Amino acid sequence: MNFDLNDIPKLSDTDIEQVANDLLNDYENNSQWTLHCPIPVERIAEKHLGYHIEITDDDIYKDTEILGGIVFEDKVIQVNGSIENHDGRYSFTIAHELGHHCLHKELFQKLSMESDEHTKMCRETGEKPLTEQQADTFASYLLMPTKFVNKAYIKAFGDTNEVFDIGY
């Protein structure tokens, strides 16, 4: 099943960052964990949102260019086995799929109800559709929240105002 591009809301990076921050805040407020880097995307997916992470080389995942997918009804995030031992790609893939959960789940389920298809979301090879671009943006904000990046920058280099000559 394909999305009708007219149904996909166009979200600004600021909107997407807010959704990622909302997930992080909700996770921190409803768990015994204090948030720190690296962001525990597996724990957020499994313990906070109730997803099962499945490492697979079956079916479409025989193609190593397809890194992950999400099955909303079964609460499964599938990750291509070829990236299991590549921490950065593995974490980004899970964060990307969480982006679909937070940004596209309701729309995808609505469209799938209209067509009676199982709601599995993954990207085919080729140009990235808007949903994939948005999920990538979400993943980057989830994995590197601005507040942590700014704090690390200031710790490493000092006052950002001096570096960028902002002069407030």
PLM-predicted stretches and their roles:
Residues 1-168:
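Active-site hotspot residues in diverse enzymes, especially metal/ion-binding acidic/histidine motifs
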